[in-house]
Amino acid sequence: MITFKSFHCSRGWHLWKHWRAFHSHSNSGTLFCQNRTTDKNTHATRVVDLSYDLYDGSVLGPPLVLLHGLFGSKSNFQTIARALVRKTGRKVLTLDARNHGCSPHDDIMTYPAMSADVCQILHQLQITNCVLIGHSMGGKTAMTVALQEPKLVERLVSVDISPAPTVPQTGFPHYIAAMQKVHFEEKMPRSTARRLADEQLSSTVKEASIRQFLLTNLVQENGTFKWRVNLEVISRHLQDLLDFPEFQEPYPGPVLFLGGANSPYISSENYPEIERLFPFANVEYIFGAGHWVHADKTHDFLNAICNFVESA
């Protein structure tokens, strides 16, 4: 049974819960699709060795594992990881997804593939149980891991994303196209390369904060600047990343869906699917936060995570 916990803003979750309880008594079995296949989740894929940072803690509880979103990297969570170690005493592991950060590039970019990558690194580090926390694309990866390998995940946090196709107003296709059009001259200072890339992106990506986020992927190799994310593969698999794999069996552990109150990525339309796959979930929204909840409202984000981790 899903419960609702108010955290600054409810966004109608409790109203939906009351409606669902009434509706399920009068029309049992009609709310959710029960005949879903899992073929997409079983295809073989090559596992890659993910780059990671491990922050040591003194508490023996399950470590916290942080998964970034599209165009992000483990460096996005440096401040968050250190704060979580201080607040919880737990070890914290941050990962670079395939085709991102310092992790290898690969031709496949699907959630089953990224789930396999995460499972492999957990096995290599002898982590048999963890608190899995993922933002956006990382949230969908975390959900996939939990649904495929529930014994690995003691509890789950999905930050501003649901187990449903991502809303069509996402700007990711435009970001990819803009990044692919950026032209870099050879042998120029980093400051110049960054300024020129920002100018070229600005015609399509109007928000300066998003441009600065994309520019964290600018790296220099052999005297030439380039994007470290694998734009070609991400572009080819973008629909896979916007969708979510099909599952029938729910995850039996506790889950927190933590959304930004100013973001459309967890809406009331997603509540039925959240309850179907994650029957022991809470949905909370942080007032004043957009899609990048951890950056917009870091203090509130940390409090929500710590309260959830310590609620066992």
From Swiss-Prot:
Range annotated as the organelle transit peptide: 1-14
Modification after translation, per record: Phosphorylated.
One Gene Ontology molecular-function label: carboxylic ester hydrolase activity
Entry annotation: catalytic residues: 136, 232, 291
SUPFAM superfamilies: alpha/beta-Hydrolases (SSF53474)
Alphabetized UniProt keyword annotations: Hydrolase, Mitochondrion, Transit peptide
EC code: 3.1.1.116
Chief subcellular location: mitochondrion
Gene3D superfamilies: alpha/beta hydrolase (3.40.50.1820)
GO cellular component: mitochondrial matrix; mitochondrion; oxoglutarate dehydrogenase complex
Signal peptide residues on this chain, from the entry's feature table: none
GO biological process: lipid metabolic process
Residue span(s) of domain AB hydrolase-1: 62-297
InterPro entries for this protein: AB_hydrolase_1, AB_hydrolase_fold
Cell compartments where the protein resides: Mitochondrion; Mitochondrion matrix
Role description: Catalyzes the hydrolysis of diacylglycerol in vitro and may function as a key regulator in lipid metabolism, namely by regulating the intracellular levels of diacylglycerol. 1,2-diacyl-sn-glycerols are the preferred substrate over 1,3-diacyl-sn-glycerols. The enzyme hydrolyzes stearate in preference to palmitate from the sn-1 position of 1,2-diacyl-sn-glycerols.
PANTHER family per the UniProt record, alphabetical: PROTEIN ABHD11
Family: Belongs to the AB hydrolase superfamily.
Protein name: sn-1-specific diacylglycerol lipase ABHD11
Organism of origin: Xenopus laevis (African clawed frog)
Native organism taxonomy: Eukaryota, Metazoa, Chordata, Craniata, Vertebrata
